[in-house]
A protein has these predicted regions:
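Conserved SAM/SAH-binding beta-strand->alpha-helix loop
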Residues: 94-97
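C-terminal substrate-binding/active-site "lid" region of AdoMet-derived donor-dependent transferases
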Residues: 162-226
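Conserved SAM-binding loop of SAM-dependent methyltransferases across substrates and taxa
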Residues: 72-86
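S-adenosyl-L-methionine
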Residues: 1-62, 100-150
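Structural motif
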Residues: 64, 88, 151-152
Length: 226
């Protein structure tokens, strides 16, 4: 049972953050390398914060959303719960272990005409300004060519990557960026304030900026346009 595996790691702290528990339990059993840190209190608080502010700033109805450094895609279900008529969500992560786990966790959305789809790809190698052209792996192992447009570009992993991805975002696309000041080796691009994040990404129209203090670190977020 899931709760016997790691009950203390799972915090469902409000109505806005919902996880498909049967899919989560199955995923944990199927993928021994599952990283429970994705369910930490700080991670969930950060996602709830993003969802609330994004919804208030621009809404979600009919939106086409790209998640850069999307990890396990745990934003997808609560976004759809808040707004079921999101057009689609695509998650991109360079880590080859992420896509299968993300699709297992979001199985119902994957099977619903690919409302959610995860792809292994470097986000710095894609042009977000136009139709994004890439190949994604299907469940049978074959690859399908994709050509997707996006209204919203979400990157909650800015501390893990250089800022080159933002060069390929247009001034008409909403940027949602999160980073933190947690000092560990894999955080090669840390940022300790929303103002510094705005400067680094070249955000010119600011819809929201703020900080979230967690037990582990302070997280900065900005929503806006270049």
């Amino acid at each position: 049972m899931l709760w016997k595996i790691r009950k203390e790691e799972i915090t469902l702290s409000s109505y806005i953050y919902r996880i498909d528990l049967p899919s989560l339990s199955q995923t944990i059993q199927e993928y021994p390398n599952f990283n429970f840190n994705c369910l930490s209190k700080a991670q969930i608080q950060s996602k709830e914060w993003l969802i609330r502010q994004l919804y208030e700033c621009v809404g979600l109805s009919g939106k086409k959303i790209a998640m850069l450094g999307g990890w396990y895609g745990l934003l997808a279900q609560p976004l759809y719960e808040l707004c079921p008529d999101i057009t689609y969500i695509r998650s991109f992560d360079i880590d080859p272990d992420c896509a299968n786990i993300a699709e297992s966790l979001n199985k119902s959305l994957l099977h619903d005409n690919w409302k959610f789809k995860a792809t292994t790809y470097s986000v710095n190698n894609l042009n977000w300004k136009e139709k994004v052209k890439y190949h994604t792996q299907k469940t049978d192992g074959s690859y399908q060519f994709m050509s997707d447009r996006f209204d919203i570009i979400i990157n909650t992993s800015c501390e893990h990557m250089p800022d080159t991805w933002v060069r390929n975002v247009s001034s008409e696309q909403v940027i949602v960026a999160q980073t933190n000041d947690f000092d560990i080796p894999e955080h090669t691009n840390r940022c300790d304030s929303p103002d510094l994040l705005i400067e680094k990404l070249g955000i010119k129209t600011i819809l929201y900026k703020g900080r979230l203090n967690t037990e582990q670190y302070t997280r900065s977020m900005v929503i806006g346009y270049k």
